Structure formats: structure tokens, C-alpha cells
UniProtKB/Swiss-Prot annotation:
Disulfide bonds join 288-314, 290-307. Belongs to the sarcoglycan beta/delta/gamma/zeta family. This is Beta-sarcoglycan. The lineage of its organism: Eukaryota, Metazoa, Chordata, Craniata, Vertebrata. Residues 1-65 are cytoplasmic. The chain crosses the membrane at residues 66-86. Component of the sarcoglycan complex, a subcomplex of the dystrophin-glycoprotein complex which forms a link between the F-actin cytoskeleton and the extracellular matrix. Residues 1-32 are annotated as: Disordered. The keyword Transmembrane applies. It is a single-pass type II membrane protein. Pfam families: Sarcoglycan_1. GO terms for biological process: muscle organ development. It comes from Oryctolagus cuniculus (Rabbit). One of its GO terms (cellular component) is sarcoglycan complex.
Amino acid sequence: MAAAAAAAAEQQSSNGPVKKSMREKAVERRNVNKEHNSNFKAGYIPIDEDRLHKTGLRGRKGNLAICVIVLLFLLAVINLIITLVIWAVIRIGPNGCDSMEFHESGLLRFKQVSDMGVIHPLYKSTVGGRRNENLVITGNNQPIVFQQGTTKLSVEKNKTSITSDIGMQFFDPRTQNILFSTDYETHEFHLPSGVKSLNVQKASTERITSNATSDLNIKVDGRAIVRGNEGVFIMGKTIEFHMGGNMELKAENSIILNGTVMVSTTRLPSSSSADQLGGGDWVRYKLCMCADGTLFKVQVTGQNVGCQVSDNPCGNTH
């Protein structure tokens, strides 16, 4: 059969192509397909896909990876916004920073008006202005506070207050002369030149004096208490007490009034003659004075009551 096929092939090649029938072509095509399929499946081994090792991020790992990527994206956006804000505030340009300068000596110089909330200078640092120019510090409807430890200087619209637990001292930076100090053991307390009054809630000192050509005025809105551990001595050419309420003098031993004592009766309350003596809850007294200046009171129990009572402290003189 093979010899016949070879002879037919030789005859076909020598005599030209031989036409095949439809059946022969179909059989030939089927044989070619079988041979092709057998060659394709020669090295194929079927394997269960579920038993293969899976690669990549799947399940929870995939979700976690997505969250990390989103978080990194948000951080990048925030970093970009902060960078743009810093760029706009500091004004960094081709010529450098337009708002400030950094020097090798450690000096930081601001070249324009700067808006800051809190400034923390370094150890032994100085905040100042340029030569022949003022350093202007303003607060937007808020006080300006300089604080170091417990010492605080507050500058407000209507007042300036200084708070310190260890004292304070003012001196001239050029001459180094002390203008004002609360170190009473070393320096005597003097008001600075131009200061007319000192407003304090409580003062503890050995002596309060005024200049020889000026008066010493002590004024309070409410109640004033002057207390001394070993007595209170008030000396002056003229001593006047003006008060809207009562004046109370207390002493363990005695109260001595030296000099001329004058009491203005026009300021003392008086009762009309039509008032009944001892009526109601009122108790009336008459103010009396001895020849040596001792004051005492006598209860008014009726009309024409004088100071001649048996238990007066004046003795035989009234």
C-alpha cells in the first residue's frame, strides 16, 4: 500500500497535480486534526487549580493594602497644603526669604510685620529692634504678656501690671543707675520721677513718708486698716481724716493724741429737739473731752445732759 502511495505520488509529481474528491479531502483534514491535537496534548498534565499556591494580596491583606495607600495619599495631600501655607507665609522666592533673614551669629531678623501668638526665646536671648527704630508690639484686643518663671509683665489698654514673687528692679540701661527697686534691705523705696500715686492692696513697711514740700495722701474706696506690731505713730504738721463712715481706734494700752485736736461738729449727725430721747432702737451719746485731750462719751438719757458725770476719766478737770 505504501508502494502504491509512493507510485501515485511520483505519478502526480510527474504528471502535475491530481484533483481529490470531497471525501478524500474530508478524510485528509480529519487525519491532520487528530495529529495536531495529539501533538498539542503531548506535554499537558491536568492539575486542580484550588491546590495551586495563590500569589498577590487577597482578602484582608488586600483591604489593608488599600487602606495604607489611601492613608499615604491623605498624608501627601496634607503635607502639600502645609508646604503651600508655609511658602505663602514666609514668602520664599528666587531671591530667598522675603519675610526673614537668618544670620550666622544666630540672629533672626524679621523684615516685615509679623503675626505671632507665643514667642519662646532661647536661653539668654534678646528680643530687640533695629538701630534708630522703635520695636512696636501690639495685641489684637488682648494684653501683651512678658513672662519668665513666676515673674510676669502684662500691658493692657488701661493699665500695666507687674507680678513677681522675688521682687523687681528698674534701672537705666545706659548709666546702669537703679531707678526703682523693691529690695528694701538694700535700697530705700522711692516712687520714680513723674509717678504721682501708688496703688496697692496691701503694703508692709517700717515707714511711709512724703517729701518736705508735699502732702502724704492715703485714699481708699472701701475700708483702710493701719496696723503696727509695736504701735502706729502718725506725725505731721497737719493731720486730717476724711471718711464717709466710722473711724475706729484700737490699742492694747493707750491712745495718745498730741497737739491740737479739732473736731468739726458740722459733719456730726444731730437730732432735732422734736425727737424723743431714747425712742426706738437708737442710743445717743455726747462726745466730751478732758483738758489733757482725752475723749470720752456720755450717754444722753434726758435733756440738758452735760459731761459732768461721776465716772468720767478726767478727774477734777473737765
